[in-house]
């Protein structure tokens, strides 16, 4: 199993159990790592019974369903929901991946969701990305102009068409 960066002197304990209230026969248990540093408590694993008949196919859909219908206090990152930005990266059943691209049907048994193991946990499934942002800034991944203009910089048709040629490669 993966080693997680837990708060010092902590032990993960059993948390709350949220029983399904829909009466559905198609239920999956989803175990989610929860920790709130403001509460001065140990991390816990909360278990949610989720009605899979009314849930879309991805793990991110399960988390959204939990947040919208069962427990609005759960904290996790999400953004594009198309596997591009990486915001929803987390550990699912022992493997790191994107919750927006991972189909819950690919995961056997109960679904265990943890934050990424190599990041300091800020809250629940949210890892500290400050080191990533510093590295990102150090490579300066933005366009730079050679001249300072007081007016808007208008792109030429050639520059726009070049951008459209490279975008599919970047998104692949």
Model region roles, listed by residue range:
Residues 1-73, 105-160:
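Iron-sulfur (Fe-S) cluster-binding modules
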């Amino acid at each position: 199993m993966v080693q997680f960066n837990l708060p010092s002197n902590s032990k993960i304990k059993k948390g709350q159990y949220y029983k399904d209230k829909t009466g559905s026969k198609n239920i999956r248990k989803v175990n989610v790592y929860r920790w709130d540093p403001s509460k001065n408590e140990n991390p816990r694993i909360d278990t949610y019974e989720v009605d899979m008949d009314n849930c879309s196919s991805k793990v991110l859909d399960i988390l959204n369903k939990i947040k919208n219908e069962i427990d609005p206090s759960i904290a996790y990152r999400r953004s594009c929901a198309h596997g591009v930005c990486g915001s929803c990266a987390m550990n699912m059943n022992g493997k790191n991946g994107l919750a927006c691209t991972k189909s819950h049907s690919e995961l056997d048994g109960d679904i265990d969701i943890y934050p990424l193991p190599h990041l300091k946990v800020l809250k629940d499934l949210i890892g500290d990305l400050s080191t990533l942002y510093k590295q990102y800034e150090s490579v300066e991944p933005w366009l730079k102009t050679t001249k300072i203009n007081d007016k808007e910089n208008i792109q030429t048709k050639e520059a726009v068409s070049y951008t459209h040629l490279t975008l599919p490669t970047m998104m692949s």
